[in-house]
Amino acid sequence: MMMDILNTQQQKAAEGGRVLAPHTISSKLVKRLSSHSSHKLSRSDLKALGGSETISDGPSQLTFKDRYVFNESLYLKKLKKTALDDYYTRGIKLTNRYEEDDGDDEIIRLSNGDRIDEDLHSGVKFFSTTPYCRKMRSDSDELAWNEIATERFKWQSMLARVLKGDIVKGEKTRIANQVKKPGLNKELSDEIWLELKAWLNGRTMQEMEQSLTYLRDSSDSVFEEIMKFQIPQGKILSLDALEAILQDLMNRYHSVVSYWPNLKKMYKDKPITNTAEFTARIDVMNSWLNFKTNLTLRRQELDDWINRFSPISSSDNCQEDFDGVPQWNCKMKILAEQLMKEKNIESIFQKKIFYPLSPWMFKLKLHFIVYRETLTKMNIKYPYERLRSLLAFPVYLIKEVILTRLSYARKLKNPTMMMIDQMIDDFNAFIRLSVQLKYTLTKYCSNLPFDVDFDPTFENTVIEAIRYLFFLLNLKLIDSSKQNFKAPDLLLKYWDHLKNTGHYINGAETVIPNEFLKLTLRLVHKLQFYLLKQQNFPPTFANASEAEKWLSSIFENLGAMKRKLNRFSNILVKAFQNSAVYQINHNAQLVKKLKDAHYFLVYSGNTFESSGVYMFAAPELLGCDNDTILRILRNKSIGCDLVPKLDIGNNLNVYDITTKETDLNILVSKGEDSKGIPYYRVVANSSSDLDRHAHQSKKKNFSTDPFDQHLDEKNNEVFELEVALSSLGALVVLYPGEPVVWDGPVYKLPGNNLFASNEMDLGKIGNPNTLILLNQGSNYALTYQIDKFNQTVGDSVSFIEKRCSLNSIESSLQKINKAYYKLTYTVLNNYKGILGSFMKQCPGNELLNSIFMFGRDFGRSFLKYNAFSSKRKYVIIFLMVKLGMNWLKFLVEECDPTDQRTFRWCVLAMDFAMQMTSGYNILALNVKQFQELKERVSVCMSLLISHFDVMGARATEAENGMQQARLNIDTEENIDEEATLEINSRLRLEAIKTLEKTMKRNPRQMGKVLDATDQGNKYLLSLASSLSNVSMRWQKRSFIGGGTFGQVYSAINLENGEILAVKEIKIHDTTTMKKIFPLIKEEMTVLEMLNHPNIVQYYGVEVHRDKVNIFMEYCEGGSLASLLDHGRIEDEMVTQVYTFELLEGLAYLHQSGVVHRDIKPENILLDFNGIIKYVDFGTARTVVGSRTRTVRNAAVQDFGVETKSLNEMMGTPMYMAPETISGSAVKGKLGADDVWALGCVVLEMATGRRPWSNLDNEWAIMYHVAAGRIPQLPNRDEMTAAGRAFLERCLVQDPTMRATAVELLIDPWMIQIREIAFGNSEKDQVPILSS
């Protein structure tokens, strides 16, 4: 069998310790071909006749083309029946349940031929270590008799002593310490300034000085005007009018400043200009003018970005008010559509919105805080309306992006698991970005005289995204047919992401807890269903080993998932329980202690009091507003951390500044992260200030920029938590059942409609004579509040339980607790079914004993981690008592008392029975049960005594017995292989037929993207006029690779969920387009006419103003070159399979009149099923073409270089044929150069070395090829004789004698793999008639 051959060769290769990376990929194809074969060829039909033109088959003569046509149809038929990976194809239905320098490092050769040894400056003695200088030392005697040389050495020594002496050293030090040359004195500099100014004005110095004196004396009016400038109260000025007034005043001020040579002179002559108020007024007017101009520019940049991002075909003329964001909506939708195609939308927001705006937002807030009083005196307001529009823009945009993504997501019916994972990542990013925007903008406007106009539906849209995220999580974790035992880990991950969302988004504080609880409940139910299914329908096992393996897997999966779910449930319980219920023991004493502890009554306007319910607030809440009380009652902080924090990884963290950080020396610096995304960070103006500011930022949380990793906040977390905890208060809801007299302080809540929500009906929580403690803030503070309250009231109350004040959440918590109870009950009550089944099929005692041990551990886990009523506790304990008794019964009746394992199990079972019957539990047994317990314990005790090892005698005897024992196993295997294969083939064919009915095909949707009336885009219009121009909704995923002109990404078709490869070619100017247009057009022309399983599928092109997107088939397996990086392919059968697929694709190309001309491992890809695909047809040409266009590519397809003529060389030298390099007029048969390149690829697969790897450069390679030499063939250890003969036919120097791809398909080396794949049975021969 084929698989036996593959497995045997794989084992041999593994023993050799070499990499077989491609083996598993290609073996899929061989298995499919062998198992799906229905039409088979005889061995006689596949015999090769060398270079003859025909082969004989009975009376008819068959040409190579006829045989190729038949084989090709059979090959294509098998590939079309290929089963795909269900991760990409199976829909999930909603159910109810990544040059060394070879020069000489020691010797540096100079241009004049001399040499210098680098050890000259290394501190080692030069004349004793360098060979070159040792020779110089041998000539020293001759130099000593040379008078000229002696004179020069003396002069050299004298110069060295002078330059190294103290005098020269001192002068060097003095010169170095001079920071600058002596400057001109002040008087001389002023005279120069005056002389220059007089010369410029055509006056003498005396005249100029008199004029300046007069002008300085008359400048007081300008300074007084600045000091008295104020916009009249009630006068409304437009921004342009105010700008004209301020600009005129500032122009006159700057004109007056020019009367003095410098500001110091002006400050001395006019002291008023050196006052703080005057300086502040100048700064305010300058800042106002700067901010108006820059905010206008930022707005214009956003408009340009929106227009540039929209497609060429967009003809929307959106008329919007300049300062009005809602009027942006028509373009928001277009922009959102385009942003959906980008993978990382957060980086788009950072580069296009946050990065340009953040420094100006920061500076405006800083100036507002510093000059607030001056702004009030001058009655000047910053251009807040423009600021509001820029602040609100990303809010409106993210809302539109969410709505657009939701509309596409809801159109998908039964999405695949890959699509679900992609959508989960998308919505998680959208929610994270929305929360960051809401938090940052709200905080930014907290001390500004305006608020951001959030879209009224923004928060509802975010909540819809949250709901849909949980819908997707349900599909992934619950509705998938596969059991996901890592679901609790995934839930914990998204809990960490979403738990603080409700603190910022109104309405999410109840949605998120309820959705997490529903998911957890469904997971527990699914786990119980899985357990029942395994108990009621266990598989049939051939031997005890299979049964033990299956049972161990069940116990491991159940136990691990139960433990993880328990831990996650406990996290939810602790996060959601915000109240403690007490019973009142002494009503009057309780009221007195509350008054003594400075509690105050919160009067609700008789809303609660009329029902006998009274609210008291802790002294920490004294002076709070109404919203604080309502947030406690409505549990707005449910699930949040004690100090909610957001990890903002973009420049939203630069927007805000605290009121204490008013140092104008603070600067904003630029930088880039590892991905090339630009960012700003806040720094100080000097190194000393930087150190100080870095220290302060930890305390004030000023710069939380993640790029500043040196700002570590861990040392401040404990202190911050302590401060937050001590500042939190609590509400006490008293339901005494009788009137309460209160003579302490009272706080009255205004209005009577504050408690309209049903969740506020606190009277339903407890019964009369009950007290409820509601904590403020995070529910993690509840334990602290309980301890604090207990110290206050003492024994006047008794603690009952913790719970959640929201009825819906408390109900879900109780349902989860009940589900755990049912699951544990199922395990403890139904273990007998599994025990009985295994006793019949596999009566191995060790396997059966593990069932009891699993039940014991499961019950213990429930009692340890779950809270429940005493009744349910009694039921579980009683079942565990019965489990212990049955365990003892099993050991007594079924196990071998002489087996050492039985002794070990008895110890465990008796210990468990003792624990479960301890205390009053023993009384739960009736007389019969107690009697049975005593008898079984008695037998087990006897067994224990019989196994006691006295003085080591038993151990010695056992050791001797083990040395004498021998294991004799006689295994007989009698399997009908033919019947097994027949059943296997039938089942596979049925599965393929079912899959074919449900497989989705990607229709080529036609559409126009370009504006046909635009005359300035002739190249784009030419591309857009192609029949392959498509219009589809797609989204960019991960980056694959890039080159000179283009980058390749994986993408997802949002309309049907298919994975695509998108080549994105940026168009910077007309010159660039003129250069790459022929390349794009040529490759499109070739790809449009090809359709074959071994050629990458081309889907179409999408044309925009600034880029062109080419859609192709996505090959997830990577390139053949990347596989060969791990080493050669050890298994020759794998090489044969790959070569077979390469020949099939190459024969199709040549039959279609296309020559690839750049075949190499980098241009050969593998899809996720391991099928070979030819890519990169930039150098390809058709037979009817009048000219040839070429392009040199890397591992990823890339449009790169300019068009070359027909006579120029194309391809990669090490894979180029001799006739291509020499430019010979004799080209041989069609595609002969491709066959040579294919032989070089097969050679590289067999040896793991590039062809001509022993040569240094491409010129040497081309010389050897043109000289008639061929690459070194594999040795006998690397390839069989048939394989080497195949290579010799490919690497023939004369192109006219070189075999074609069709001829190579019936080479004996290919016949071998074809027979293995398709078979050679005589009864299934298919006659072929000559054409």
Swiss-Prot record:
Residues in the signal sequence: none
Chemical reaction(s) catalysed: L-seryl-[protein] + ATP = O-phospho-L-seryl-[protein] + ADP + H(+); L-threonyl-[protein] + ATP = O-phospho-L-threonyl-[protein] + ADP + H(+)
Annotated GO biological process: p38MAPK cascade; stress-activated MAPK cascade
All copies of domain Protein kinase, residue ranges: 1034-1310
InterPro entries: Kinase-like_dom_sf, MAP_kinase_kinase_kinase, MAPKKK_Ssk2/Ssk22, Prot_kinase_dom, Protein_kinase_ATP_BS, Ser/Thr_kinase_AS
Gene Ontology terms: cellular component: cytoplasm
Keyword check for ATP-binding: yes
Binding-site list for ATP: I1040, G1041, G1042, G1043, T1044, F1045, G1046, Q1047, V1048, K1063
EC assignment: 2.7.11.1
Active-site residues per Swiss-Prot or TrEMBL entry: D1158 (proton acceptor)
Parts of the chain that traverse the membrane: none
Keywords annotated in UniProt: ATP-binding, Kinase, Nucleotide-binding, Serine/threonine-protein kinase, Transferase
Further remarks about this protein from its record: Present with 56 molecules/cell in log phase SD medium.
Family: Belongs to the protein kinase superfamily. STE Ser/Thr protein kinase family. MAP kinase kinase kinase subfamily.
Subunit record text: Interacts with by SSK1.
Name listed for the protein in its UniProt record: Serine/threonine-protein kinase SSK22
Organism in which the protein naturally occurs: Saccharomyces cerevisiae (strain ATCC 204508 / S288c) (Baker's yeast)
Gene field: SSK22
